């Protein structure tokens, strides 16, 4: 099968991908965007977004992504369902395989594949997604003002999330599997000195319960030991802070990544080390992971693609 040739290929359909499509379409780059397995990305699992400028009453993640999608289509972006399964960025035009069969040859590529939150693997995690389970305290913490929440994890991210939530919630339980925190000393100190945070060392979360949302977590203290204890803890929100996995595997042979797989770009730009290949959104952002920062880098990537093609 002969490869399809395009000027600008965008891989991923969260705020980064859709914003890149809007800007690329307006620049007459005739962008083709493949939406992946979850059109709209992780934001479609967020019930309410209240921190994106321009939505004074808030908006659901699903509706925001649908609006961005329509806006991209309005300017002529070609949006398609399909997943990038292989990549050859060794030379231009760059070859991207979709669903293991169709090959696209692109003069420029914008990687906006995002990063997936790591889950514990509990049967109830997906059931309560958007109904008490979250992987982003900055995104969803506002909904738990004066409520009781639990954060799972023992590293810097977990401590940062717990500290942030302590400024909103009435009580924060930090559930730590090990008998110690892995976080930096300054973050450990911040957590241990916060009266609102109670650290539950040597605890495992093994399940969630609730009728119309999370009402509590099933815990095991000192799992596997002779004095193992099982009990339930009433909470209103359950925050996962055990890391994210960037969706960058197929690009790793060609672009630089950090030790966890986030694509490295030139500081202040979405440019990777491969000319004409750009990374936008959470796949290149281990720090902020916000809709607005993802959209901003999507814009930057499209502008860079336009400039690259002009030159």
Question: How would you describe each model-predicted region?
Answer:
Residues 79-142:
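Glycine/small-residue-rich loop that forms an oxyanion/phosphate-binding "nest" at active or ligand-binding sites
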Residues 72-98, 103-106, 167-267, 307-311:
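A Rossmann-like FAD-binding core segment of flavoenzymes
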Residues 116, 121, 126-143, 242-288, ...:
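FAD-site-proximal beta/loop scaffold in flavoenzymes
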Residues 5-7, 81, 145-147, 202, ...:
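Phosphate-coordination loops involved in phosphoryl transfer and adenosine-cofactor binding
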Residues 14-15, 38, 115-117, 156-157, ...:
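Residue-level detector of alpha-helix initiation sites
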Residues 163, 167-171, 292-311:
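Internal hydrophobic alpha-helix adjacent to the cofactor/substrate pocket in enzyme cavities
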Residues 6-75, 159-185, 258:
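Beta1-alpha1 glycine-rich phosphate/pyrophosphate-binding loop at the start
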């Amino acid at each position: 099968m002969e490869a399809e040739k395009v000027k600008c290929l965008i891989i991923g359909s969260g705020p980064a991908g859709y914003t890149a499509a809007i800007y690329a379409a307006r620049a007459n780059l005739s962008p083709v965007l493949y939406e992946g397995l979850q059109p709209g990305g992780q934001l479609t699992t967020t019930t309410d977004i209240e921190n994106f400028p321009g939505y004074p009453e808030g908006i659901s993640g699903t509706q925001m992504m649908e609006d961005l999608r329509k806006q991209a289509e309005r300017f002529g972006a070609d949006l398609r369902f399909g997943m990038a399964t292989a990549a050859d960025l060794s030379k231009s035009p760059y070859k991207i395989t979709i669903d293991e069969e169709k090959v696209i040859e692109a003069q420029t590529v914008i990687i906006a594949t995002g990063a997936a939150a790591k889950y514990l693997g509990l049967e109830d995690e997906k059931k309560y997604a958007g109904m008490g389970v979250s992987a982003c305290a900055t995104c969803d913490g506002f909904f738990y003002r004066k409520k009781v929440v639990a954060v799972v994890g023992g590293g810097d991210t977990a401590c940062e999330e717990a500290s942030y939530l302590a400024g909103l919630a009435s009580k924060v339980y930090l559930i730590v599997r090990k008998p110690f925190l892995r976080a930096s000393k300054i973050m450990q100190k911040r957590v241990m000195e916060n009266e609102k945070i109670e650290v539950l060392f040597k605890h495992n979360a093994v399940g969630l319960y609730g009728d119309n949302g999370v009402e509590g977590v099933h815990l095991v203290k000192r799992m596997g030991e002779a004095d193992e204890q099982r009990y339930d803890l009433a909470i209103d929100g359950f925050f996962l802070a055990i890391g994210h996995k960037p969706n960058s595997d197929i690009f790793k042979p060609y672009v630089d990544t950090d030790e966890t797989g986030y694509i490295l770009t030139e500081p202040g730009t979405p440019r990777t080390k491969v000319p004409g290949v750009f990374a936008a959104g959470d796949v290149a952002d281990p720090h902020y992971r916000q809709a607005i920062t993802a959209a901003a880098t999507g814009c930057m990537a499209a502008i860079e693609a336009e400039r690259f093609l002009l030159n």
